[in-house]
Design a protein with these regions (language model features):
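P-loop NTPase motor module signature
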Residues: 1-428
Length: 430
């Protein structure tokens, strides 16, 4: 088995979890935490044959993580390692490690709040701070406190330097820190980007330059599907007749076959140019990539309480995301990252992104908390849900008939909460 940076701290992690029911693991991109940690803890005495649940922020990452873990054991998925994602499940009677998406756990908790038979919940990539991850952690901690007789351990794994803040949330849990990625990544800065500047020509020019100057496949980060489509069209024209270059889009709306084509090794004698959204920022190893081209932008949903509408905003990424993206180039060998902004602009970026819970529509969260029977203040959060957005979500639920005049869940609301859809859609479906 190939050595990874995370291996050096696995004894300390085992010791931390043997002595406490919570721990935080801080490890940069490429350290190997997703692949190594669940297997390292599988035979710990305190687990006593129970299951490990590991949460991933996206379906593609969950499936890929399960496949890598199973391969490490020399087995197929569905034996000791399985996964559950929306509309797809691959687990068996021998499964001890279940890799699930965050929304799957949040819904499982509603039916099984004590998580019977589970001995450890691992929140991988917790630094992404998705709404589902925050909700799942809050419900896990509350269900454990109220309903568990046997210990349930919780491990938060983060690639950013927020370990102390996460530790405070978990009653000053021990923080275990791993050193850097396996291979160095050279960062090459671009000129300062300008507001309103068309992104695609700069991306295409940089990709063509990288193909000429560097070996290996490329991973290109773009904000959305529209930019991916336009860059693919322009690169297709520029690379016409080049049978050695394969263009592969990668975003959440693609089917499984297209997603696999993007992350699997390029055929012999060819190189890939993977055009991806931030779906490729964490948890995925795209074989053969040693060059990253980062446009430095992302598209995020932002809720406006004054209008009750959610809009998609394109914004600059945080420095933590830029580090994550660059790390994709150093997974398997020394790499290069082209950033399409200047070093001066980089220094002005926020250190971390804004947690989804602070800028999202909270109607779905309000419905799940009503089903759980609590108010936000009764649970443990890294960031408390904003009062205005939460109140607006509750108001919409009452207008949809999900809550009665006293704010209690109705039978219609119970049925809505069981559907994996926004409450507006669930109401229409019922």
């Amino acid at each position: 088995m190939k050595s990874l940076p995370i291996d050096a701290v696995l004894p300390a992690l085992r010791e931390a979890l043997a002595g406490r029911h919570e721990a935080v693991l801080e490890a940069p991109p490429g350290a190997g935490k997703t692949t190594r940690v669940p297997l390292a803890l599988l035979d710990e005495p305190w687990l006593a044959g129970q299951t490990i649940l590991m949460l991933e922020p996206r379906r593609l990452a969950a499936r890929a993580a399960a496949e890598r873990l199973a391969a490490e054991l020399g087995e197929g998925v569905g034996e000791r390692v399985g996964y559950r994602i929306r509309l797809e499940s691959k687990v068996g009677p021998r499964t001890r490690i279940e890799v699930v998406t965050e929304g799957i756990l949040a819904r499982r908790l509603q039916d099984d709040p004590a998580l019977e038979g589970v001995g450890l919940v691992i929140f991988d990539e917790f630094h992404e701070r998705s709404l589902d991850a925050d909700l799942a952690l809050a419900l896990t901690l509350n269900g454990r406190a109220l309903l568990r007789d046997e210990p349930l351990k919780v491990l938060l794994m983060s690639a950013t330097l927020e370990g102390e803040r996460l530790s405070r949330l978990l009653d000053d849990a021990p923080v275990v820190r791993s050193e850097g990625r396996m291979h160095p990544v050279e960062v090459r800065w671009g000129r300062a980007s300008q507001p309103g500047e068309h992104l695609e020509p700069r991306v295409v020019q940089t990709v063509l330059q990288a193909l000429a100057d560097e070996p290996g496949s490329l991973l290109v980060f773009l904000p959305g599907q529209g930019e991916i489509r336009r860059v693919a069209e322009q690169l297709g024209e520029a690379l016409a007749g080049r049978d050695d270059i394969r263009l592969c889009p990668l975003h959440g709306e693609l089917d499984l076959a297209a997603q696999r084509a993007a992350i699997e090794p390029a055929p012999a004698g060819t190189r890939k140019v993977v055009l991806a959204t931030n779906i490729a920022e964490t948890s995925l190893t795209i074989d053969g990539v040693r060059v990253v081209v980062d446009a430095g932008l992302e598209r995020v949903p932002r809720f406006d309480p004054s209008s009750g509408m959610t809009r998609l905003d394109t914004q600059r990424i945080a420095r933590a995301s830029a580090i994550q993206r660059a790390g994709r180039a150093g997974r398997l060998e020394p790499g290069v990252c082209y950033r399409l902004w200047s070093e001066t602009q980089h220094d002005q970026l926020p250190a971390y992104g804004t947690a989804e819970i602070l800028q999202a529509d909270l109607t779905g969260l309000a419905l799940q908390l009503a089903r759980w029977g609590v108010e936000p203040g009764e649970l443990a959060w890294l960031d408390l849900p904003p009062a205005a957005a939460y109140a607006q979500g509750r108001d919409l639920l009452q207008r949809l008939g999900a809550l009665d005049g006293q704010g209690s869940l109705t039978r219609h609301g119970q049925a809505m909460a069981e559907l994996p859809a926004h409450p507006r859609i669930a109401h229409l479906l019922l």
